[in-house]
């Protein structure tokens, strides 16, 4: 699988305020974060500071020529992967296991479920964005001026590739 799990968007800089971008006709400030990291430097410890910028849509990856480029990535900031695995392991039925999978905290992976009741279920559980536009791929940014230009949700869970109780009675998978 090679799903498209992220998109690069080009936002217009507010010409009157260089640390703001224009979205939905409003000037919105970029969020600045200074990160300090201590590291070993010979016998001592040094500290290095870096400045990062972000928007609610995703982190800024580049700024130039009146544009702010951001990357919007599936599951960015979602740290519930461990919780999802725990819920999967504790599931006592296919319905409970599917509920755990609906968390979509695992960005991409194939999963197999089987139980004593004879259920065998295969699922590619990707957090694939439902793009409202053709993807820019890895080579071009998609212009974003309003919410309708930006992906805001994933492809529905029940639309993901899956197979329940295969006709042959088993599943062979070398991708999990």
Segments (PLM) and residue ranges:
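Mature extracytoplasmic enzyme cores
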Residues: 1-176
């Amino acid at each position: 699988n090679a799903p498209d799990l992220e998109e690069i968007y080009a936002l217009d800089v507010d010409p009157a305020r260089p640390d703001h971008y224009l979205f939905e006709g409003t000037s919105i400030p970029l969020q600045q974060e200074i990160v300090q990291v201590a590291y070993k430097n010979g016998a001592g410890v040094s500290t290095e500071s870096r400045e990062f910028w972000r928007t609610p849509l995703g982190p800024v990856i580049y700024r130039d020529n009146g544009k702010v480029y951001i990357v919007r990535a599936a599951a960015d900031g979602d740290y519930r992967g461990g919780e999802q695995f725990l819920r999967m392991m504790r599931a006592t039925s296919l319905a409970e296991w599917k509920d755990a999978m609906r968390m979509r905290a695992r960005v991409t992976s194939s999963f197999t479920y089987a139980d004593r009741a004879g259920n065998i279920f295969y699922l590619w559980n990707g957090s694939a964005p439902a793009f409202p536009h053709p993807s820019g791929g890895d080579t071009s940014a998609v212009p974003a001026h309003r919410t309708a230009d930006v992906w805001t949700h994933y492809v529905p869970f029940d639309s993901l590739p899956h197979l329940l109780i295969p006709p042959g009675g088993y599943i062979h998978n070398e991708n999990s």
